[in-house]
Amino acid sequence: MLDREGYRPNVGIVLLNSRNEVFWGKRVGQHSWQFPQGGIQHGESPEQAMYRELHEEVGLLPEHVQIIGRTRDWLRYDVPEEYLRRQHATRVHRAAYRGQKQIWFLLRLVGLDSDIQLRASEHPEFDAWRWVPFWIQLDAVIGFKREVYELALSELARYLSRGVRMHQLAWGSPLDLLQSFYSKGEEGSPESSKTDKSK
């Protein structure tokens, strides 16, 4: 389902723990990390899509989380043509499809870490996860999504405590933060990552 401009409606999820750290998932078989996200199906509201994607990708139910806030409007990113070719998209789809437009939700985990299950669906999105600081360096995110991630985090930060917001002002852009985050262990497979133990 595309809009008139060729963007697919989508939701993104920033999941917080009690320390205001965020869920960071490693994509199956890849070295890239990202937040949970997924398309909005026909007839779904953004909130309904968010809960469905939350369960499919992270294994959490509505009772495991609290909605803190969401972005005011859609945030968009374009998918490069070369990426679409690698994904074997059809010519018709490539001609119409430009990228994603996303509503981002900020959630608080009120359940336990053990409630997170990466194999809740038949086609898992992630094979490892970890908690990371809110202003995570975005080098491990695929390039064309980084600007939207920065915009989403910057807008959602208004819902957090003053201390976390002031951290943004002190350090500047999230892209400049935590330069040594992936210096421990091999990049893309941090030693402290939590893997899916149900395999």
Swiss-Prot record:
GO cellular component: cytoplasm
SUPFAM superfamilies documented for this protein: Nudix
CDD domains, per the entry: NUDIX_Ap4A_hydrolase_plant_like (cd03671)
Taxonomy, superkingdom: Bacteria
Short motif (Nudix box): ranges: 38-59
E.C. numbers: 3.6.1.-
GO biological process, alphabetically ordered: mRNA catabolic process
Cofactors that this protein relies on: a divalent metal cation
UniProt enzyme class: hydrolase
Annotated transmembrane regions: none
Occurrences of domain Nudix hydrolase (ranges): 6-154
Gene Ontology MF annotations: mRNA 5'-diphosphatase activity
Record keywords: Hydrolase
Its biological purpose: Accelerates the degradation of transcripts by removing pyrophosphate from the 5'-end of triphosphorylated RNA, leading to a more labile monophosphorylated state that can stimulate subsequent ribonuclease cleavage.
Family note: Belongs to the Nudix hydrolase family. RppH subfamily.
PANTHER family per the UniProt record, alphabetical: M7GPPPN-MRNA HYDROLASE
Official protein name in the record: RNA pyrophosphohydrolase
Gene name of this polypeptide: rppH
